Amino acid sequence: MIQTIDLKKGMVFERDGKLLKVLQINHHKPGKGNTLMQMDIQDLRSGSIVHTTMRPSEKVEQVNVDKRSAQYLYDEGDSAVFMDLESYEQYSLNHDLLGDDKNYLVENMKVILNFVNGDIIGVELPTTVELTVAETEPMIKGATIDGGGKPATMETGLVVNVPAFIKNGDKLIINTTDGSYKSRA
C-alpha cells in the first residue's frame, strides 16, 4: 500500500477493484484546509479517463508492472500491433488504451510494453521520435525564424506547432511527453 502523495505520472494502482493509471497529477492547496491530489486517471480495462480528487493520506494498492522490449509493427483496425523482441509474440493494444500515444507510433519503432498479470496495459515511448511533416503552410515572406510558428500535421496525424521555416517533407524530432517540436532531424 502506498499513499496517494507518493503517486507519480505513469504509475499503476488498484482502487475499488479497478486497475488505474495516473495520466496527470497536481497537488492543490486551497486557501484554508488540507492539500488535495487532483488526478486524471485511466481505467486500464475500459480505457475511460476520469478526473478525481483524493486526500494525500489515502492509501492505494500499487500494482507491479512487468516491462518488455517490443517493436511497433502496424495498425489493425482500432488496435496497434506490437512484437515482443525476445519471444517474437505479437500483442494488440486498443487505441483507446494508447490514448494520444498512438500519434507518435511509426513502423519498426522500439517501445516498452507494460504488463500486469500477463495482460498488456500500456506502452512507454522513447522521449523523442522522428516524424515527417505531411502538411503545413508555406513560409510567409517576411516571417522571422523566431516568430510565433505555425501548425504542421505530421505523418501520424499529430499536429505540432513548428517554426515558420519548416516545410512539407521535413523530418522533425518531436518530444513525446508534451508533443512539442525540438529540432530538425
Curated annotation (Swiss-Prot):
Descriptive protein name: Elongation factor P
Alphabetical list of CDD domains matching this protein: S1_EF-P_repeat_1 (cd04470), S1_EF-P_repeat_2 (cd05794)
GO molecular function, one term: translation elongation factor activity
Gene: efp
NCBIfam families in the cross-refs: efp, PRK00529.1
Record-linked HAMAP family: EF_P (MF_00141)
Cellular component terms per the entry's GO annotation: cytoplasm
Keyword Cytoplasm appears in the UniProt entry: yes
Primary subcellular site in the record, as a coarse category: cytoplasm
Pathway(s) the chain acts in: Protein biosynthesis; polypeptide chain elongation
UniProt similarity note: Belongs to the elongation factor P family.
GO BP, one annotated term: peptide biosynthetic process
Subcellular location: Cytoplasm
This protein's UniProt keywords: Cytoplasm, Elongation factor, Protein biosynthesis
Function noted in UniProt: Involved in peptide bond synthesis. Stimulates efficient translation and peptide-bond synthesis on native or reconstituted 70S ribosomes in vitro. Probably functions indirectly by altering the affinity of the ribosome for aminoacyl-tRNA, thus increasing their reactivity as acceptors for peptidyl transferase.
The keyword Cytoplasm is assigned to this record: yes
